[in-house]
Amino acid sequence: MKTTKDFWVMKNEGKKIVMITAYDYPSAKQAEQAGADIILVGDSLGNVVLGYDSTVYVTMEDMIHHGKAAKRGAPNTFIVADMPFMSCHLSIRDTLLNGARLIQETGAQAVKVEGADEMIPHIKALVRAGIPVVSHLGLTPQTAAVLGGFKVQGKDGEAARKMLEDVKECQEAGAFALVLECIPKQLAQEISTTLTIPTIGIGAGVHTDGQVLVYHDILTYGVNRAPKFVKAYANADQLMLKGLQDYADEVRSMNFPDDEHSFTMKEEELKTLYGGRG
């Protein structure tokens, strides 16, 4: 399993970091088999798996439940678990308690915290307590309503300068890596060059130190409409739907189960079932 130090080395050597967001045992297992460097158990599970229209409904219990499953599926991969909405905002004490729960109860190696500014003291507290932190800036889904919806961030000079200040503060607070979501590729390149910690982009161009996409988006699995920054590498929905339809057709036509998928008993044993009558 890689460590935080390994990711810094990868950045310095120009080796791209592959992160996949996965939410359960089978998806995490496949991500590990595919060679992902990091698995993110994201609070986007609220949208993708639980059917919510926002991540704000995701609870600590949800994150722990899914984090445990992902860890069982990928025991040899570095796992980052999201701190869900309001789990690290009310007080430093709450932040530490919730961060400790995520690490202890899921087996994750790190937590991810959205935002800068008022979150900086919380990041510092987590790091001081021995909990590795990934920061998340740009489009931060938990506060999308405040940002004016799901749209590209840092497009004008003032916003870009503020983001440059924010990422430096996150690094100084002790974050070992940074997720950059939905920002101009030029800004992402500038940030990646400026920081000593690795950057992982999602909708941030090719010049970040790594990339992250959601398992379901990569495979077109249960996805209604993917964002512009998503590239699908397979169509699982199409394949799975055909499999389910074929199953239903064979049940109705009595072609399933056939002899290959059924069990039998010896003829003499069958006779005893009927009291010896043949």
From Swiss-Prot:
Chain residues that bind Mg(2+): D43, D82, E114
Cross-referenced HAMAP family: PanB
Pathway assigned to this chain's UniProt record: Cofactor biosynthesis; (R)-pantothenate biosynthesis; (R)-pantoate from 3-methyl-2-oxobutanoate: step 1/2
Protein function: Catalyzes the reversible reaction in which hydroxymethyl group from 5,10-methylenetetrahydrofolate is transferred onto alpha-ketoisovalerate to form ketopantoate.
Cofactor: record remark: Binds 1 Mg(2+) ion per subunit.
Keywords: Cytoplasm, Magnesium, Metal-binding, Pantothenate biosynthesis, Transferase
SUPFAM superfamilies to which the protein is assigned, alphabetical: Phosphoenolpyruvate/pyruvate domain
InterPro entries: Pantoate_hydroxy_MeTrfase, Pyrv/PenolPyrv_kinase-like_dom, Pyrv_kinase-like_dom_sf
Gene3D superfamilies: Phosphoenolpyruvate-binding domains
Entry keyword Metal-binding: yes
Residues holding 3-methyl-2-oxobutanoate: D43, S44, D82, K112
Pfam families listed in its UniProt record: Pantoate_transf
Molecular function per GO: 3-methyl-2-oxobutanoate hydroxymethyltransferase activity; magnesium ion binding
Source organism, top-level taxon: Bacteria
GO biological process, one term: pantothenate biosynthetic process
Family stated for the protein in its record: Belongs to the PanB family.
Chief location category: cytoplasm
Reactions this protein catalyses: 3-methyl-2-oxobutanoate + (6R)-5,10-methylene-5,6,7,8-tetrahydrofolate + H2O = 2-dehydropantoate + (6S)-5,6,7,8-tetrahydrofolate
Protein name in the entry: 3-methyl-2-oxobutanoate hydroxymethyltransferase
EC number(s) per entry: 2.1.2.11
Cell location: Cytoplasm
An annotated GO cellular component: cytoplasm
Cofactor: Mg(2+)
Quaternary structure, from the entry: Homodecamer; pentamer of dimers.
Active-site residues, Swiss-Prot/TrEMBL: E181
